[in-house]
């Protein structure tokens, strides 16, 4: 009996070791050639965009992961982290794969270039990406790093995605690329693009699966304690709240505005906001209506009216419709009401649904 218990305990210990430590590869690391993965970093890079893939891809003996930058200087990331790159373009090991993270803006007009926006004007960076892509086995962008791939000419004729807030802009600047919003990452074979931030981890997990199989990817996910859901298909850019146009928020958003609650899905969403304003509910609603009219949305039927005195009625809900670039029709309903008895507090409910 003692011999059986001892044997069982030893087997359990071996099993736990296999699934909990990704570095303990099932094959001998000494007999496998390591894949060099270079992760580009630059001033303004988003932290999770490069550290997420670094953690996942670095969790195993088969990959040698390192950061690379144009110069050896200290990099200041988004949110102020200070990082020293492992290598520069001049002294890096020859990469077999590269990761291009995002951060900052994407070169849109009227803003000071920062992060990716600044790198789009950096010929040394664009040249490194272009020349590396010609030699490596895999290229992956994270977030708005896709704009760097686009500038390097790597997305023409392909399908791609990016972070939710830049989907439409990528489609605008990359007319030869099919830009999608309903996928967390897009695999074109050699070129992989992912959504924003944590989507880079899923892109890295997918790459591990491509390179080493589903089992190795599962083992890695367990080792880094990541709830990997390869079949989930969740995409931030594919959620309906993104269909509420920015000018609506511009009307009521201020330093004291807070999101009270939110529910969002691919075909419908609801947001409840509380804000401070000296406007009455009717005045606030009127300004939101004017904002929607200014961007060519169409007023829909079904406006709800409320008596504010014996002789007047004021709308409390207005509805507007719009057809997006993919031909889908959306309706937004706006409800404005006092948040409390105290003057100067409003509750604004925004609902959007596909119709």
What are these regions (language model features)?
Residues 1-4:
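Positively charged n-region of N-terminal signal peptides that target proteins for export
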Residues 34-38, 159, 190:
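Residues that mark the start of a beta-strand
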Residues 155-182:
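A conserved active-site-flanking secondary-structure segment within enzyme catalytic domains
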Residues 25-139, 147-151, 181, 205-355:
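Extended, subdomain-level signal for the structured scaffold at the beginning of enzyme domains
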Residues 180-194, 225-226:
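Conserved Rossmann-fold dehydrogenase catalytic segment
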Residues 7-18:
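Bacterial N-terminal signal peptides
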Residues 192-205:
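Active-site-proximal catalytic alpha-helix in oxidoreductases
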């Amino acid at each position: 009996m003692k011999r059986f218990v001892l044997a069982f305990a030893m087997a359990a210990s071996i099993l736990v070791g296999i699934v909990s430590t990704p570095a303990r590869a099932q094959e001998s690391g000494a007999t496998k050639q390591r894949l060099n993965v270079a992760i580009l970093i630059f001033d303004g890079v988003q932290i999770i965009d490069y550290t997420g893939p670094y953690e996942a891809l670095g969790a195993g003996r088969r990959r040698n992961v390192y950061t690379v930058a144009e110069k050896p200087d200290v990099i200041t990331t988004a949110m102020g982290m200070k990082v020293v790159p492992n290598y520069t373009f001049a002294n890096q090991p020859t990469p077999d794969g590269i990761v291009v993270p995002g951060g900052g803006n994407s070169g849109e007009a009227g803003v000071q270039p920062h992060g990716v926006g600044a790198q789009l004007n950096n010929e040394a960076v664009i040249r490194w990406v272009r020349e590396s892509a010609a030699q490596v086995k895999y290229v992956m962008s994270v977030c708005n790093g896709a704009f760097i791939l686009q500038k390097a000419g790597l997305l023409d004729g392909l399908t791609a995605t990016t972070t939710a807030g830049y989907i439409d802009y990528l489609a605008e600047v990359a007319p030869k690329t099919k830009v999608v919003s309903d996928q967390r990452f897009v695999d074109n074979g050699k070129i992989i693009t992912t959504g924003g931030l944590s989507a880079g981890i899923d892109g890295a997990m997918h790459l591990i699966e491509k390179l080493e199989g589903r089992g190795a990817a599962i083992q890695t996910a367990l080792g880094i304690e990541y709830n990997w859901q390869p079949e989930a298909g969740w995409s931030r850019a594919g959620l309906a709240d993104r269909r509420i146009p920015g000018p609506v928020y511009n009307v009521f958003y201020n330093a004291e505005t807070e999101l009270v609650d939110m529910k969002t899905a691919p075909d419908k969403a609801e947001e409840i906001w509380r804000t401070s304003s000296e406007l009455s509910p009717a005045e606030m609603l009127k300004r939101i209506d004017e904002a929607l009219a200014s961007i060519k949305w169409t007023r829909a039927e079904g406006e709800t009216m409320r008596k504010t005195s014996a002789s007047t009625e004021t709308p409390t809900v207005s509805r507007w419709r719009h057809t997006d670039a993919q031909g889908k029709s959306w309706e937004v309903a706006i409800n404005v009401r006092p948040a409390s008895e105290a003057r100067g507090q409003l509750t604004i409910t925004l609902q959007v649904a596909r119709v």
